[in-house]
C-alpha cells in the first residue's frame, strides 16, 4: 500500500482531498492521486464509504470536521512516484500487515476493512 506522510500532522495516510466544482467523486480521487503522488490511475474500484464519529478529525490549526470518506483501490496505475512537496513529507510502500503505528486516526477503520476483505479473497 502506498502511503504518504503529511506535512501538516506528520502522520501517514492515503492520497485524498475535497471534490472540486464539476468533478465526480472518481475524478477527484484520480486528481488527488496524481497531485499528491504523481501517479495516473488506470483502473479504480470503489472499496469503502466511511462516515460518522470515527471520521472526526481535528486539524493542526484547531478546525474540527466530520469527513465523509469514499475510498477507492487503485491496482493499475502508471507514472513516476513524486510527492507534492507542500502537503507530503514522504511517500512509501508498506505491506498491508505492516502499516505504521503513526497513521491518521480516521483511516484506521478503512485499513481494518481492507484487511478483512483480503482475508475473504
Feature-to-residue mapping (PLM):
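The catalytic Nudix box helix
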Residues: 14-48, 72
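NUDIX/MutT-family hydrolases
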Residues: 71-73, 82-113
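Active-site-adjacent beta-strand/loop module that shapes the phosphate/pyrophosphate-binding cleft
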Residues: 50-80
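Residue-level structural signal for beta-strand termini and adjacent loop
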Residues: 7-9, 25, 87
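N-terminal strand-loop-strand
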Residues: 1-14, 41
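A short, polar/proline- and glycine-enriched secondary-structure boundary/capping micro-motif
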Residues: 12-16, 92-95
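Glycine-centered loop/turn positions within well-structured domains
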Residues: 10, 35, 79
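Acidic/histidine-enriched, glycine/proline-rich intrinsically disordered or flexible terminal extensions
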Residues: 116-121
Amino acid at each position: 500500500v502506498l502511503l504518504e506522510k503529511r506535512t501538516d500532522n506528520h502522520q501517514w495516510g492515503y492520497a485524498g482531498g475535497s471534490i472540486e466544482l464539476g468533478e465526480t467523486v472518481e475524478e477527484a480521487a484520480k486528481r488527488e492521486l496524481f497531485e499528491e503522488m504523481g501517479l495516473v490511475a488506470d483502473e479504480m474500484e470503489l472499496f469503502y464509504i466511511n462516515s460518522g464519529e470515527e471520521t472526526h478529525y481535528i486539524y493542526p490549526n484547531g478546525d474540527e470536521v466530520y469527513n465523509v470518506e469514499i475510498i477507492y483501490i487503485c491496482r493499475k496505475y502508471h507514472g513516476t512516484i513524486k510527492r507534492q512537496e507542500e502537503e507530503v513529507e514522504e511517500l512509501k510502500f508498506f505491506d498491508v500487515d505492516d502499516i505504521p503505528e503513526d497513521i491518521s486516526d480516521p483511516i484506521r477503520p478503512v485499513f481494518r476493512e481492507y484487511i478483512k476483505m483480503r482475508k475473504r479473497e
